[in-house]
Amino acid sequence: MLFTFAWASLAAIFTFSIAMVVWGRNGDGTIDF
């Protein structure tokens, strides 16, 4: 259970960081990476 939760949170953080990078590059420029 704990192992599954760890993988789920890791995948969520990874997906979120990728989304933020894409948003920063293609967005309105308010978030700059």
Curated annotation (Swiss-Prot):
**Keyword match Electron transport:** yes
UniProt xrefs under InterPro entries: Cytochr_b6-f_cplx_su8_sf, Cytochrome_b6-f_cplx_su8
What keyword terms does UniProt attach to this protein? Electron transport, Membrane, Photosynthesis, Thylakoid, Transmembrane, Transmembrane helix, Transport
One Pfam family from the UniProt entry?
A: PetN
The GO molecular function terms of this record are: electron transporter, transferring electrons within cytochrome b6/f complex of photosystem II activity
Q: Which domain of life is it from?
A: Bacteria
Localization terms from the record: Cellular thylakoid membrane
Q: What sections of the protein cross the membrane?
A: 2-22
The Gene Ontology biological process terms listed for this entry are: cytochrome complex assembly; photosynthesis
| One Gene Ontology cellular component | cytochrome b6f complex
Q: Which SUPFAM superfamilies match?
A: PetN subunit of the cytochrome b6f complex
Membrane association type: Single-pass membrane protein
**Which family is annotated?**
Belongs to the PetN family.
Entries under NCBIfam families matching the protein: PRK02529.1
- Function description: Component of the cytochrome b6-f complex, which mediates electron transfer between photosystem II (PSII) and photosystem I (PSI), cyclic electron flow around PSI, and state transitions.
Q: How does it assemble?
A: The 4 large subunits of the cytochrome b6-f complex are cytochrome b6, subunit IV (17 kDa polypeptide, PetD), cytochrome f and the Rieske protein, while the 4 small subunits are PetG, PetL, PetM and PetN. The complex functions as a dimer.
Q: What is this protein called?
A: Cytochrome b6-f complex subunit 8
